[in-house]
């Protein structure tokens, strides 16, 4: 039986970061991936002459070489060096305000000053509340950096002295704090646009998590790799190999092995058994506990926690390869949010069923990267999120008809709301549903976002409870369902943070 210092199961963003950190720490590390390529959701696929980005709209916390964000620093520390494109604006949103009457069409730029100035132009009198929001974001980001630097073992007194608002506001929701800041309602509607990126309505979404994400996008901009997410994840895989890591592709981890004390002793795979005392799983915890562990080693607390949590957003994506350029079609924006209403609670409820869900985000990659597809063409994706498991109610015999009808609805709504025509120019079309995510990424209900970051179960308590979040000796979880929640940068940070924690535990064991 081959022996490794650590085994990483799953080569998604979190797993790749964890594997790279373990290898960089000098540990003999094995990375197991059931597919023939890395990435999980962070990948690409081809149809005809088009290569489609599977999932990424834009990555935050990247930044420039001169002013890098934390995510870029981490990946470049591993040796990643690939070309990137910066998205010129943060987003455009076209919708109806929560009052049900006012039309919103707003494009928000990068940099805090320009963002605040544009918000003041759109909603006179909101300047102070928006500026205060970014000031809080600066404090929150600094608090997050401090927590990462000490692997979650924060000093309460230091936190109280340096990050009082982080502690004071950490348990509150977005809308509650917006109201307390006396932010005008129309400004709240616009500022809530990014809620879909975290999959929780603003009445329940963690203010800390949301503002931190917004601050990162505005300060460091949004970025995409030159050749889709596949370039990012294959690049990280190459970094891992260059540091001496071993990779088993087309290999499925089927069972985690334990010793008499219920500590990890190895992994059973379709390629044979492996001996190790440390496993980092880039998988949903519920899947691991239910299918890869004997019941007697699963702590009762983790069963209760799994039942208490709510699965987050389930993706539905329409991929369009169009035989006209973005300019010819009149598509000028990279990202456009197209909800029916700025009332996030209403949109969240509507997103629970196929019949009522009309929310979507349009991305046109060629606006930022003209060479993304062949000359004279462009690639557009329309993404909708489901907030409940309504696709489980679809009869398999009706699946193709149901997904096709919903895709046609999204295309029609996009044309109406954005004011362009794309249907006659569709050369290639592919559809991904929550079932697709279940099949390819092995996530329950297709919930690629992991668990909802809301109320008691947001990033702050997860980070603070890191010590009890992983009670089984030798096993930790990384990725979207882990401590940081969803998002490429969050998944990468979770892998890096928990690998560092594992390295520290190894050092203590050796002492």
What does each model-found stretch correspond to?
Residues 2-139:
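N-terminal glycine-rich phosphate/pyrophosphate-binding loop and immediately adjacent elements
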Residues 99-205:
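Rossmann-like flavin
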Residues 188-201, 357-363, 420-484:
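A glycine-rich dinucleotide-binding beta-alpha-beta segment and adjacent secondary-structure elements
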Residues 214-264, 270:
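Helical element adjacent to the flavin cofactor pocket in flavoenzyme catalytic cores
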Residues 254-374:
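Mid-domain catalytic core of redox enzymes
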Residues 258, 504-511:
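Active-site-proximal substrate-binding core of FAD-dependent oxidoreductases
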Residues 325-435:
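C-terminal segments that line or cap access tunnels to active or ligand-binding sites in enzymes
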Residues 480-502:
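A conserved FAD-binding loop/helix module that cradles the flavin
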């Amino acid at each position: 039986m081959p022996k490794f210092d650590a085994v990483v199961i799953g080569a998604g963003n979190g797993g790749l970061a964890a594997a790279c950190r373990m290898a960089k720490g000098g540990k003999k590390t094995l990375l197991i991936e059931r597919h023939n390529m890395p990435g999980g959701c962070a990948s690409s696929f081809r149809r005809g002459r088009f290569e489609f980005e599977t999932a990424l709209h834009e990555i935050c916390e990247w930044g420039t070489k001169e002013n890098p964000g934390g995510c870029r620093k981490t990946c470049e520390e591993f040796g990643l060096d690939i070309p990137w494109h910066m998205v010129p604006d943060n987003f455009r949103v076209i919708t109806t305000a929560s009052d049900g009457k006012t039309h919103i069409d707003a494009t928000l730029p990068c940099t805090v000053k320009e963002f605040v100035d544009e918000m003041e132009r759109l909603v006179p009198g909101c300047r102070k509340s928006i500026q205060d929001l970014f000031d809080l974001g600066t404090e929150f980001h600094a608090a997050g950096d401090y927590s990462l630097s000490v692997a979650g073992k924060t000093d309460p007194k230091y936190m109280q002295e340096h990050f009082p608002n982080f502690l004071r506001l950490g348990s509150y929701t977005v809308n509650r704090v917006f109201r307390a800041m006396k932010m005008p309602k129309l400004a709240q509607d616009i500022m809530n646009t990014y809620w879909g990126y975290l999959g929780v309505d603003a009445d329940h979404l963690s203010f800390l998590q949301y503002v931190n994400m917004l601050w990162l996008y505005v300060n460091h901009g949004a970025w995409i790799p030159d050749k889709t997410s596949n370039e990012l994840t294959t690049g990280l895989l190459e970094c891992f190999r260059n540091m001496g890591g071993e990779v088993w592709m087309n290999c499925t981890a089927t069972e985690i092995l334990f010793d008499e004390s219920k500590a990890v002793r190895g992994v059973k795979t379709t390629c044979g058994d492996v001996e190790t005392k440390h496993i980092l799983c880039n998988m949903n915890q519920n899947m691991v506990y239910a299918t890869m562990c004997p019941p007697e080693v699963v702590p009762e607390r983790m069963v209760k926690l799994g039942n208490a949590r709510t699965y987050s957003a389930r993706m539905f994506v329409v991929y369009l390869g169009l035989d006209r350029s973005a300019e010819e079609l009149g598509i000028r924006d990279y990202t456009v949010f197209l909800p029916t209403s700025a009332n996030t609670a209403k949109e969240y409820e509507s997103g629970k069923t196929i019949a009522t869900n009309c929310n979507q985000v349009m991305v046109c990659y060629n606006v930022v990267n003209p060479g993304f597809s062949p000359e004279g063409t462009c690639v557009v994706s329309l993404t909708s999120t489901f907030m409940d498991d309504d696709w489980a109610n679809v009869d398999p015999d009706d699946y193709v008809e149901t997904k096709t009808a919903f895709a046609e609805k999204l295309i029609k709504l996009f044309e109406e709301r954005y004011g362009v025509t794309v249907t006659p120019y569709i050369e290639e079309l592919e559809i991904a549903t929550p079932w697709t995510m279940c099949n390819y990424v092995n996530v329950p209900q297709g919930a690629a976002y992991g668990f909802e970051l809301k109320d008691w179960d947001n990033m702050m308590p997860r980070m603070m409870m890191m010590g009890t979040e992983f009670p089984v000796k030798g096993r930790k979880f990384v990725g979207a369902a882990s401590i940081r929640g969803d998002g490429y940068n969050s998944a990468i940070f979770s892998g890096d943070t928990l690998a560092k924690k594992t390295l520290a535990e190894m050092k203590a064991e050796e002492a």
